[in-house]
């Protein structure tokens, strides 16, 4: 294996795959994952709505295997900001040792990254809902204060003046809130654009890394074969 993919990482990957229920017995990972079906099942385990299993046909033929991986690349992996290069796919289809492990390890990282982003998004939504609930309670409080003021309490207040004050306060609060939301939305847009740029660069680097690792594996195996002769 390449230097970047040590034995400990390999074992962690196998342990991770073993925790996921798959439709076939786990025998030889290079052959088991060569047609892309189990890779699709693996992603579906974490993101059920992301994968439609009828698109992936169990296959022994190279043509069908390539078709499965092409669909998987386009419809699923791309949504995880991940793409497997064509020459790497060909090596997976040919059951080249050590290649599918590199892809699965990167896929595992992408799945974990998407899960983290999902949790962050859920937390932000919850915070926004909490803030909205707080604003609703404040509005009720203002109405309550308005109804409690009465001539019986010794204070004669012009109803038109009181109403005007209430509207002015509400308008100021609403303007401030809109301004804050606009600032947050602008910050979020800028952050999303930055993330997209970084993800594009990361995808390119990951593809280059996969290609390099596959090349190193090939050279290592050839060297070992020469040493045996």
UniProtKB/Swiss-Prot annotation:
Subcellular location as annotated: Cytoplasm, Cytoskeleton, Cilium axoneme; Apical cell membrane
Cellular component aspect of the GO annotation: 9+2 motile cilium; apical plasma membrane; axonemal central apparatus; axoneme; basolateral plasma membrane; ciliary tip; filopodium; lamellipodium
Pfam families per the UniProt record, alphabetical: CH_2
Annotated knockout phenotype: Morpholino knockdown of the protein at the four cell stage results in loss of planar cell polarity protein asymmetry, defects in cilia polarity and affects microtubule asymmetry.
Membrane-spanning segments: none
Region of interest (Disordered), residue spans: 122-169
An annotated GO BP: cell migration
Domain notes: The Calponin-homology domain mediates its binding to microtubules.
Protein name listed in UniProt: Sperm flagellar protein 1
Organism: Xenopus laevis
Gene behind the chain: spef1
């Amino acid at each position: 294996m390449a230097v970047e993919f040590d034995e400990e990482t390999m074992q962690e990957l196998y342990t991770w795959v073993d925790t996921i229920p798959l439709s076939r017995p786990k025998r030889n990972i290079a052959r088991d994952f060569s047609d892309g079906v189990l890779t699709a099942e693996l992603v579906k385990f974490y993101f059920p709505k992301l994968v439609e299993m009828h698109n992936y046909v169990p296959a022994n033929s190279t043509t069908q295997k390539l078709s499965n991986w092409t669909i998987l690349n386009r419809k699923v992996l791309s949504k995880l900001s991940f793409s497997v290069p064509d020459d790497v796919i060909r090596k997976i289809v040919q059951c080249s040792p050590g290649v599918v492990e590199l892809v699965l390890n990167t896929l595992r990282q992408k799945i974990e990254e998407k899960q983290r982003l999902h949790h962050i998004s859920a937390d932000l939504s919850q915070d926004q809902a909490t803030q909205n609930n707080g604003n609703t309670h404040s509005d009720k409080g203002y109405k309550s204060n308005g109804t409690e003021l009465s001539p019986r309490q010794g204070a004669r207040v012009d109803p038109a003046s009181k109403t005007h004050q209430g509207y002015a306060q509400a308008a100021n609060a609403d303007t401030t809130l809109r301004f804050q939301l606009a600032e947050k939305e602008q910050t979020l847009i800028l952050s999303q654009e930055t993330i997209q740029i970084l993800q594009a660069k990361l995808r390119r680097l990951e593809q280059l890394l996969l290609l390099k690792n596959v090349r190193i594996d090939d050279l290592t195996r050839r060297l070992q074969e020469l040493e045996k002769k």
